[in-house]
Amino acid sequence: ANNAGARKAIRKIEARTEVN
């Protein structure tokens, strides 16, 4: 399986944490 999807999701979560 490709980790691209997981990495994209993690980046999305990371961005959300940065906003907090």
From Swiss-Prot:
Alphabetized UniProt keyword annotations: Ribonucleoprotein, Ribosomal protein, RNA-binding, rRNA-binding
Signal peptide, first to last residue: none
GO MF entries: rRNA binding
Keyword flag Transmembrane: no
Top-rank taxon, per record: Bacteria
A GO CC term assigned to this protein in UniProt: ribonucleoprotein complex
Family, as annotated: Belongs to the bacterial ribosomal protein bS20 family.
Function: Binds directly to 16S ribosomal RNA.
Protein's name according to its UniProt entry: Small ribosomal subunit protein bS20
Organism: Brevundimonas diminuta (Pseudomonas diminuta)
Lineage: Bacteria, Pseudomonadati, Pseudomonadota, Alphaproteobacteria, Caulobacterales
Gene: rpsT
